[in-house]
Amino acid sequence: MERQVRGWTCSAAATDWLLRATGLDPYSTREKVVAELGYPGCIDEYSGLKDSRCIQRVIEQYDVRARQEWVGWERALQLARSTALILNSTSWYHFVAVRGLTEIGDLWIANSAPLYQAVGEVITRRDWDRLPGWQAIYIVND
């Protein structure tokens, strides 16, 4: 994933990646996503993303259902096996898209700020426990 230029745009980067990776919007850009999220109501340079439901709303503009859910490690792994999702930890204050699982069963992520708080392209169980308060915004597969 291309690195974020501004510190407050990780949620837009993750949403942009999800839209392009799933084919919902192959021509998406981060700037377009910032506008779709709602600048400055839902996202701005002072607070970043103010409400994860704004991501859910953007995804649902593409005629798919999305859900926001507080998740534990096992649920995150389950979602990563079955659908496209974005993760955020309230103690990490950073959003990433999930590519899937690694060969050893960790979360393989698309991270616009690699090594922020020592997390690169993988979230391990140790990272998960170290950065509590995880939520997922994901596409609901009917």
Mark where each language-model region is.
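Active-site nucleophile-adjacent alpha helix/oxyanion-hole segment immediately C-terminal to the catalytic cysteine
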Residues: 1-41
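Conserved active-site-adjacent core of cysteine acyl-enzyme catalytic domains
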Residues: 20-21, 32-142
